Regions:
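Assembly/oligomerization scaffold segments
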Residues: 1-134, 187-190, 194-195, 204, ...
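Short acidic/polar beta-strand-loop edge motifs in secreted extracellular
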Residues: 43, 127-149, 158-184, 208, ...
Length: 359
């Protein structure tokens, strides 16, 4: 969860007055410090290659300034490298606002009509997604240095200190997909990566552990307005097989079984008495231990889209981010740990929507 003072945390437990501050930057230069945001929203979805997307509605003309970029590539709302820095304000009393930094977003499209301008922006991994290789790329060095080669200088990378770096096997090659290469390295390293609110790519071990940052309840004094659950067998599995090869070309594999007794897909449980595997492979895994760790991490990641999920409608909480662990009471649950998989934060007075996965 993003940093918030105790005062702001208490305010967002009930209806409150909010504001959004949007700045436009390009190549380190501030182009506009106070974009007049009339409406908008922020969407985050951990299952997407670029998880973040925002939409802003801005008056075409405000305070004598035209916010329609037209054909001007240097306009604050043009889509030629302009970035939006978004902060969400909470009125903590006396007209004073506490500003929560929601992050940096790359403008991808701007359109206008007679009265309004609509701006669409996405997370900074868009740079990596767009940048296909102009020639086949052969990684060398280590997993960490390969990630730096894939994303820098577009993004600065920080690595969690608990990750153990290792050499990349020779002979690998990616033909065009830079972001796909990044995903393959992360999978082989049993790691996750996301862009922080500071615009830095943080690489850390895959994990669903953590102390709940917030308790959601529909009871007295709660902030939840509505719960809605869903379940499906589509794409379900009860084990993951990760395949690699050693330096001699011998095929290796590691298997991770879903042995969580609380999981509806538990291996050996009523979901299916037989193994239902999800299989993936990468030459970056060169030992059985690496394959086993990769399989265990992939099992956690895939559960983000196949486990029991709940849709939550609630009073907006600008500190919440995708991946945060919350505690849920309602919809048949009591203090159940859940991970936020998707969220929609309105940039005007409205309700916030979450999709949470029961852990």
């Amino acid at each position: 969860m993003l940093d918030m003072s105790d005062v702001a945390l208490s305010v967002v437990q009930r209806s409150f007055t909010m504001s959004v501050r949007a700045e436009s930057w390009r190549d380190g230069d501030l182009l506009a410090a106070d974009i007049p945001v009339a409406d908008g929203s922020e969407d985050r979805d951990r299952s997407l290659a670029v998880p973040e997307r925002i939409s802003l509605t801005v008056p075409r003309r405000d305070r004598g300034y035209t916010w329609d970029p037209g054909a001007d590539p240097d306009h604050p709302l043009a889509a030629y490298g302009q970035q939006l820095h978004i902060s969400y304000g909470v009125d903590i009393g006396g007209g004073d606002f506490e500003w929560i930094d929601r992050g940096w977003f790359l403008i991808t499209e701007t359109s206008s009509d007679d009265t309004t301008v609509t701006v669409t922006a996405q997370g900074l991994l868009t740079w990596v997604d767009e940048a296909k290789f102009v020639a086949p790329f052969q990684p060398s060095g280590t997993l960490a240095s390969t990630i730096r080669s894939l994303v820098e200088p577009a993004l600065t990378v920080n690595f969690d200190g608990t990750l153990v770096d290792r050499s990349v096997p020779v002979g690998m090659q990616w033909d065009s997909d830079r972001l796909g290469g990044l995903t393959e390295v992360l999978d082989a390293w049993a790691a996750d990566a996301y862009v922080t609110e500071d615009g830095v790519l943080l690489v850390e071990p895959v994990s669903d552990d953590g102390t709940p940052v917030l308790s959601l309840t529909d009871g007295h004094g709660g902030t939840v307005m509505h719960w809605q659950g869903s379940s499906s067998r589509d794409g379900a599995f009860n084990c993951v097989v990760a395949q690699g090869e050693d330096a001699s070309g011998n095929q290796l594999q590691g298997v991770a079984y879903d042995r969580n007794s609380a999981s509806p897909f538990m291996f050996g449980g009523p979901f299916n008495p037989l193994a239902v595997p999800y299989t993936y492979s990468s030459p970056l895994m060169t030992t059985v231990d690496q394959c086993r760790k990769g399989a265990a991490a992939k099992l956690l990641q895939l559960r983000r889209t196949t486990s029991r999920r709940l849709a939550v409608t609630m009073v907006p909480h600008p500190g919440l981010m995708a991946g945060d662990i919350i505690s849920a009471t309602g919809a048949g649950l009591t203090n159940a740990p859940c991970a936020i998989e998707t969220l929609t934060l309105p940039y005007s007075p409205s309700e916030m929507n979450l999709t949470v996965r029961v852990l």
